[in-house]
Amino acid sequence: MARDAMGRTTECQDSILHYRKFGRIPEGYNLPMNLQEFFLKQKEAVRQRTRQVAGMVRPEQMSWRPEAGALSAGQLLRHIWVSEQGARKAALEGDLSYYETRIPKGLGAVLGQVGTVEEELANLERVHGETLEAARAFPLERWDEERIHEGLNIRRKVCVILLGINEHEIHHRAQLMTYLRILGAPVPEAIRRR
């Protein structure tokens, strides 16, 4: 796939130019950003919102779940960082051991014991920092490499796995916010203003 000096595909360039021509994208909007830079910027923006929601969880809410069999609030916090760590290792190190356990044995096999709110929030930050550092150091020309595990029927590009980390976090952040709203938490001010 052809890429320009910024790492953008021809299709991506054409799309940006098309929308800018018709006035839908302001001049200069993300033009000097390659896929790696986009991921890093998006990752930080996603985490900023997650910090707002995760910071609302109180210790007495960690074990709450909406129904039997659902993840608890604490398990959701833990799942976000545990899965991010596993996905990052798969993408950037080619280590699919997280999925070798997770897929056949289920989430419980990789989740581990939930800690305190403070411990889970610290792990969210630790893993986030590790992901940013590793993604920043990973050469842009390798972002199209595939990670393959025939036994698990996995065939994904590095960039797809990494962008999936962000989508996964957004999904579970919304789930956690739903839990908190059920428990009577107010909508965070930053969200209410929108």
PLM region spans:
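Short, charged, low-complexity loops and linkers
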Residues: 30-41, 112
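Acidic/histidine-rich alpha-helical segments that form the ligand environment
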Residues: 108-149, 156-171
